[in-house]
Amino acid sequence: MKHAENEYLNLCRHVMEHGTKKEDRTGTGTVSVFGYQMRFDLSKGFPLLTTKRVPFRLVASELLWFMKGDTNIRYLLQHNNNIWNEWAFKSWVESDEYTGPDMTDFGLRSQQDEEFKVQYDEQMELFKKNVLEDDEFSNKYGYLGDVYGKQWRAWKTTAGETLDQLKDVIEMIKKTPDSRRLIVSAWNPEDVPSMALPPCHTLFQFYVADGKLSCQLYQRSGDIFLGIPFNIASYSLLTHLIAHECGLEVGEFVHTIGDAHIYTNHFEQVEKQLAREPRPFPKLTLNPDVKSVFDFEMEDLTIEGYDPHPAIKAPVAV
């Protein structure tokens, strides 16, 4: 029987073989295709990739951060999650208050220059310490703009009010499960210019049939090697959490990607991953005593039977 992970591995193969070479804002370069869809049956295991280790702890803490409506990296740092650091760090080193060594193009330079990487690591550690310990600094430089959490939980209206899209969609699933309006959008054109990183996963929609909750994500831009594995796990987890509160079983996670790309400096890593055989997906267990999605904490989420191949490191394009 075909392993569900092949949905992802086939995406990698397709882009490597048929992708178009493109330039990008990071200066790294990509190969990409436009318009690709994957489907995962969530009743047959939790789609945490096994051909390389994907850290569930980071996936879960980021999702809980989104769901809290938080847009400051302090919560993530408190949970030893560093995946958003570079975007906050960028605003700090480009500010008038920063007086340390030149950090221009730190993403690329830290990969190419060992001496610079030492300086970069020192400045990043100092930055993280300040975000964790200095409230004023954290409020100013730990803040990422009105990114996912703000749009999900406090979308600004023209009337000066806010909409809690996530809370509203959960209530709609309970009351009108056949609605075709079970949608949450993170793409707010007015706020995009002030965001540290405009939303890559832009809109998601729920669908209820036969007592099962399915979710489809539209992602405008997907970093196939580093980002997409996180996105698959994150929205699968979100579907489980909402199904749990609504008294539903899980159905499918459908992942639709606009610009699906592999960075040129990830080719070697992708080839290494494609040479590996998938292993059985793990099982996700939720604390049955927690009833609301907004009350879940890290200790309420458990992954069992996860036996992946080793992690494969790759640089992040900032």
UniProtKB/Swiss-Prot annotation:
Main location: cytoplasm
GO terms, biological process: dTMP biosynthetic process; dTTP biosynthetic process; methylation
Gene3D superfamilies xrefs: Thymidylate synthase/dCMP hydroxymethylase domain
GO cellular component: cytosol
Reactions catalysed: dUMP + (6R)-5,10-methylene-5,6,7,8-tetrahydrofolate = 7,8-dihydrofolate + dTMP
Subcellular location: Cytoplasm
Family note: Belongs to the thymidylate synthase family. Bacterial-type ThyA subfamily.
Protein's name according to its UniProt entry: Thymidylate synthase
Species, as recorded: Bacillus cereus (strain ATCC 14579 / DSM 31 / CCUG 7414 / JCM 2152 / NBRC 15305 / NCIMB 9373 / NCTC 2599 / NRRL B-3711)
